[in-house]
Amino acid sequence: MTGDPKKLLYDFTAGMGAFASETELQGKQAAAFLDMVRINFEDSVLDFKTKELVAIGVALYHRCPYCISLHAFCALEAGATKEEIMQAAMVSVAFGGGPSMSYTVTLLKDALETFKSETFRKEDREVILKRLGMA
């Protein structure tokens, strides 16, 4: 396994908060980044769920463990099914080959199991949604 999906999600969201609070400039940079992401993920011609499925494919292609964990969580929050997520993942495998497949069958699989399990409590979900500005 390439990492604990829950820990990766907590570390990323905590890291963004810590980065933003270090200096005024970093606060502005973090806010600008998060605004750009928020705007790009708003419902438009493509809905939020579809955009999260695209993001999973991109994250797998680039082999970013933090991105894979984050977008697996967000896709589930948007109502994506495991089957939809795995099909989006397989599109990335068509372009990324073995490395994308490796992350699909390990980290993505673990993330889906983790975020749908009892070990990922309601409190965990609330903390992450608040940190992401989705609460």
Predicted regions and their residues:
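Short, thiol/selenol-centered motifs that function as redox-active sites or metal-ligating centers
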Residues: 54, 58-70
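Alpha-helical scaffold segments that form or flank carboxylate-/histidine-based iron centers
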Residues: 18, 49-59, 88-94
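Acidic, glycine/proline-rich low-complexity segments that act as flexible tails and inter-domain linkers
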Residues: 1-50, 103-135
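Mid-chain, well-packed structural core segment of small domains
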Residues: 65-91
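Short Fe-S-cluster ligation motifs
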Residues: 90-107
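N-terminal, well-ordered alpha-helical segments
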Residues: 31-35, 48, 52, 56, ...
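Alpha-helix N-cap/helix-initiation sites
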Residues: 47-48, 65, 82, 102
